[in-house]
Amino acid sequence: MSNVLITGCSRGIGYELARLFAQNGHKVLALSRNDKPIKELENKNISAFPFDICSDKDFEKLEEFLKDNWGTVDILINNAGQLLNKPFLQTSRIEFEEIYKVNVFGVAELTRLLIPKMSRRGHVVTISSMGGVQGSMKFPGLSAYSSSKGAVITLTELWAEEFKETGPAFNVLALGAVQTEMLEEAFPGYKAPVSAEDMAAYIMDFAMKGQGYFNGKLLQVSISTP
């Protein structure tokens, strides 16, 4: 069984990922600022504590947990993300920076911390968005969010090249519309064709097997617009 670290687990896809991995017997460290929903699952395979991906102190807490409990990590799923749906001219520098702190800098720091704890067969899966894919349809109000999701696509390609001799593998999934609270914030009233649970099942399977077939690749996981 694998040691799986997942961020953004308080709701939506991250919550369903933690639940599914644990149900299948894997050890899960589920990280999010609000750990109450995950703890309410009362699953012995899930460890959780409040974690702010922008907090140095929380990273120190994470290092201590890994040292004392796991030692190694097999799968990292960078799922945590923050949305801002706001016209560009009304978006302040601070608001723009906040999105990048979570969606880019936090992802980079967590990945940097975990790479030395992962084997050649390990797999880092970063969750991006179709809005971050070059040439995809773009939507007003998502300048900060979609550009940050484009940044982690490029980071994934760079990491795969830099660590191609030693591993782990790095891949990025650009998701289309999934029925989550974040989708409702971005596109109020839109009904997505895919549920959070169904998407989580796909991501879990890819995280377990995808490194045998892909490295440094962007996979567009979408059947609708948006």
Give the positions of each predicted feature.
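N-terminal Rossmann NAD(P)H-binding glycine-rich loop of SDR-like oxidoreductase domains
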Residues: 10, 18
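Conserved glycine-rich Rossmann-like NAD(P)H-binding loop of the short-chain dehydrogenase/reductase
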Residues: 24-39
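Rossmann-fold cofactor-recognition segment
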Residues: 43-57
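Substrate-binding pocket helix/loop in short-chain dehydrogenase/reductase
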Residues: 87-88, 95-97
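Catalytic loop of short-chain dehydrogenase/reductase
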Residues: 125-151, 156-157, 161-164
